[in-house]
Swiss-Prot record:
Pfam families: PDXDC1-like_cen (PF22930), PDXDC1-like_cen2 (PF22937), Pyridoxal_deC (PF00282). Its EC number is 4.1.1.-. It is an enzyme of class 4 (lyase). Belongs to the group II decarboxylase family. GO terms for biological process: carboxylic acid metabolic process. This is Pyridoxal-dependent decarboxylase domain-containing protein 1.
Amino acid sequence: MGNHLSDAMKILESGKLETEQGQEGRKMSWKEIPGPLQGDGQDVVSILQLVQNLMHGDDEEQGHRMQFVGEQGHMALLGHSLAAYISVLERERLRKLTTRILSDTTLWLCRLFRYENGSAYFHEDDREGLLKVCRLVMNTHYEDFTTEGFTALSSKHPVIYQSAACRPGLGQHLCSQLGLPLSCLCVVPCNTMFGSLHQMDVALLDKLVKDDRDSGKLPLLLIANAGTPGAGHTDKLSRLKELCVQYNMWLHVEGVNLATLVLGQVSSTVTAATKCDSMTLTPGPWLGLPAVPAVTLYRHEDPALSLAAGLTSSQPVEKLRALPLWLSLQYLGHDGIVERIKHASQLSQQLLEHLKTLASIKTSVEDELNSPVVVFRFSHENSAPSSGGSVEGSYAGERDILDAFNRWLGDQLAEQVPLSGVDVVELEDEGTCVRFSPLMTAAALGTQENDVAALVEKLAEMIPLLCCTLRLRQDFRDEVLQQASLSYIEDLNWPGLGVVRFEPRTTDLDEDKRQDRVEKINSDLLKKLMELDTDLNFSGGPEFSEEKNCIFIGIATEDLDVAELVETIMSLGRDIEESGKLFENMTEVVRKGIQEAELQLQKANEEKLMEEGVLRQIPLVSSVLNWFSPVQASVKGRTFNLAEGCLDSTEPVYSIKAQMRKEDSPDSPKANTRRFPGQKLFRRPGAGSDSISETSSVSQLEESFRETLHSQAADEAEVPQERPAHILEETAIADQRVPEGQEAESVETIR
């Protein structure tokens, strides 16, 4: 067993896949329907290789591989294998062994987290412990609950109280599993005037409990937080415990801040959790241990009720859940456990100290001296006002825009500094914030001090970009509104300069055709803007955005020339619109010209046939007649003049073309301006070293774009796609001619 486990870890963590031939076979077959089991079975290495292929799929990047779990993680994984192995022992020996494992683990956890005279329940789902505690409390208050069920609750309906800052869906899950109506759940609001906005309002809780008791209900249990899921704040546990004692309620505490109980110095607010009736711990993420169970510590004197509630079990196999944690705690030792929790707390303090020095960053922490969770948010309060006035109150939806900016900030920090473990959190009062909770991520990711320093460095680079983008956003809106052909799209969820749409000036089209033209123009305009040499990011917007056929402009720089940017978008849009009209008109004119040329050539062929007679149409006879009496005239080709829109004979084309070539000068100058190497577009003069050229970049773009359109128009005129094959030989488009020596061939011969 040990060899198999060692082989498994080596294969799954090595990152080395099978040979190239095996890779090709896997790409072709692993997603197909599996075949039957092999009769002689497979070896362990082959099975583990299959597991690895299913885990990684078609991912080629090493970053998607399973992270290295370390030696302590190997001990936790070994515990699951040992649990399966131990379960086949003799029943009496199994009972003694599981009792020892359970008692040892319970004793160690109670001492580590300062929870005296407690019992432990190990469970996979971190909500299951609270669910069992609720059953225990219901069995305590309702003696006939185990036999009569819900009818025993009819005399006094139970009430479960939870904070509004608890994790979403927790109370609903409890009611669903216990068979209670949602009316038995009471959500207590948080403070609104005094104290933390994420702490339960104790005075309001007292009032709610009194009202429920007066109405004949039974206050059953209170769920408090020692570290809310969002901001990491701790409720006033001492005051809540007093209320629970007063009204005979059970107090249950959960949260990430409970991990700090293992430290030598703990805040008094968290220390009060040791007096609660039960608490749920999640040592897996705190210590970086994969697949270890959560633990609920509780105090209760009646073991029969605990057994009825499912907190204890008479089955020895159930007690083996504690085995992975039993092995891991021994491997780490007391000092190793304390060191990991202490390291995570120090990372939080390090980040908090650096955030105090950054402008435009607001933090939301409960205790600046000891806060395991750091929540911060970009704010414009310290930003300089724009040219149009102060940012404060200068636009509607200010909160939504800042939320979008902070969402972008959190995503960028998580992408560029992945070892920091930051994520985006939505808080009811503060809005969208960035959260750093090393107690939940540092042990698994291996976060160190240099990762926090890199996080602060990236944050310092992004703050000026956010500030100037926020200032220029209103200026961009004003510039766009001054252009008749541009529409400003108000998208408060877009973290960038703004959203714009080019509107064609044609009004004689129906709505469907107009929408198609808007889509085509804005799509081509977006492609042209993305090809420009600029620091701005142009895109079509988020995948599920409500606004379609728009151009989304991303984060701006300090030296951005908004007027030049809008003028460039306007000029490029007009050129694309005019070129579209030119191509449409040209296609119609060419089509009519080809039809008229066909009629003229058909008429000329009929006249020629009448003049020559039928005998000249016979191959052998025509040769004899042509030798005695040569043909004097032939059908002349037709040339279509795009400039004048008329059909002419090809006879004078050659002489006119030759004269035009003589008059053309090969050295005629062309107006073609170029930017200096490294120069960026949309830079204000004097803003940086790139602003060197005196020529407007808009004129440069117009000139280069018109040259491209001219070449496209020439290609379209020379080879019209709608022309039949026989017309390609008979009709010369624009300035194409048929040489004199080839005019003797008739249309029928060419066909």
